[in-house]
Amino acid sequence: MSSVIQLRELQKSYFMAGQAIPVLKGINLDINRNEYVALMGPSGSGKSTLMNILGCLDSPTNGMYNLNGHDVSKMLDDDLAGIRNVEIGFVFQQFNLLPRLSAAENVALPLVYAGISKKDRIDRAMVALEKVGLADRSHHKSNELSGGQIQRVAIARALVNNPSILLADEPTGNLDSKTSVEVMELFGKIHSSGNTVILVTHEEDIARYAHRVVRLRDGNIETDTVNNNFSHF
């Protein structure tokens, strides 16, 4: 199975008062195409920093990051932004929808930056909304949608570019238990359709939906295990 992500001796330090503060201390990790992986770890483990690097929102201090055949380790910001828009679909805890836009217009936003025509943008947005069961809410704005529906719109937006990776950061953090289960079942269906899913969470109940769990502690990978008891949707 081919790797969509390869990390080799990945390090990240932040500098404060001229002193290097190591956050990631030599991460080695392979994630294969169509895997479903949960990244876990307590506060201060380096989990959020690793997510930012995987999402091309930050760059490592040292080491190698290969994303779907691209060495992104030393890319400049403009190049990183281009790779990010093509290769990665983001789902955030805070949804980040624009309230003045309809669901379809929010979903189509990544295609604006890709230079896609307006008609094609809306057509592709409707396909993505269909995947998450919200085609009949395409003209609704966020204040006309429930929390679960808003997160489904955010997931559709992440899928609209057909990215190599769906990267979800605490995607159920603002949802009640019932809606969280519905959203996680949707991620399971998305994974089953062929997408690579990386889920960042601190909740064991959410991580159990993944097929593999990588736990970080103090900037290192503590365990990397297959989850034989993952929840079926």
Predicted ranges, named:
Residues 3-216:
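ABC family nucleotide-binding domain
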Residues 213-225:
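H-loop (His-switch) and adjacent beta-strand-loop-beta switch element
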Residues 1-13, 223-233:
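ABC-family P-loop ATPase nucleotide-binding domain
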